[in-house]
Each structure stands twice: as structure tokens, then as C-alpha cells.
């Protein structure tokens, strides 16, 4: 995600990466536009009220994500992956549009070639994430997708990968499966058990 100010045209150009790896939030009030890679930065402004967006909360509790760029705070929105925002300083308005959309097409490749390509692209993707300016970790559920990512990640790093598994204290937890993968890949593994009490106690700090 990035922002560019065009001095000649007096326009601000914001864009978020195609897959939404990096976040970008914005808020428009009285013709002014505030933006940041973190919501907490926008909340530091005195004119911003910390009001809960109940519609977004309902979406999150139903789908585990919010829709149409809404966040859990009223009047603060998320620029969606592959979107750009152009703000005009002269008339103090902005427009949002898509600069990229996923182009799906049918492939005639053989199964073996598809597997070969998949491995290549997965390794390339993981390598890009290793260039992060923050410590790299992985959520490990014990399922096929996260186990595959952790296995590949472990082969590409010198230090043990930090992995995390969450559970809720019942028989459906995937601690056992995740531990098997962790032991096999020699990761620095952490198990986190969530409970209703822990979640309700943490809610005031989250909000």
C-alpha cells in the first residue's frame, strides 16, 4: 500500500496491493481525508469519535470478516485489495475504483504440471513474505493448507519457525494434529486456548 501526493494537480493517490497483504484505512470528515496503515493512528485524531459500527460487528460475528470495506469503527473504512482512491484537494472529494481484478481462466495443464507450478508459486510467495520487516510466524491448524505452508517455510529458514495454534478446550481442537506437524518441522510452537471468559475480558481493550 502507498500514497502519492501530486503537487501540480493537487490530488492524493492511495492504492492497496492486489491481494491485500498490507492494510490501508481511511476516514473522510467534512471534506478532509485521513489515512493510515493502522486504525489506531486515525483514532488519535481529536475529531474522530470511537463509535462501534454495529453493522460491521454483526458481519464479523456472522462471517468472520466485514463486507464492503467496513471496519468495527464508524466512519473508518478499509481500502479493499486491488483498489485505488483519488482525493481531489480542490473540491475535497474522492473516488474509489478497482485497478486490478483476479482473472480466472480454465487450464489445460496436466496434473503433474499443475502440481509443479503450484509448488513453484507457493515457494515464491513464501519467499516474498520472508522479506517482511516484522518477525515471521504462521498459524498452524494441523490441516492440509497450513501444514504445507509451515513445511515449506521451515525448509526456507535457518531458525525454527514460530507457529501458533488456537483451541477452545473441547474435542474439536486441533492441538494434536498441529503438534505432529510442529514436531516434524521442528517449529517453535505455541498453543493458545481461548475461552468465553478470556474473550469477554479482552473485549474492552480490543475496542
Predicted regions and their residues:
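Residue-level signal for inorganic ion chemistry
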Residues: 2, 85, 182
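N-terminal segments that mediate ammonia production and transfer
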Residues: 5-109
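Generic recognition of flexible, low-complexity loop/linker segments
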Residues: 1, 71-74, 126-127
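ATP-dependent adenylate-handling active sites, centered on carboxylate activation for C-N bond formation
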Residues: 7-33, 48, 89, 103-207
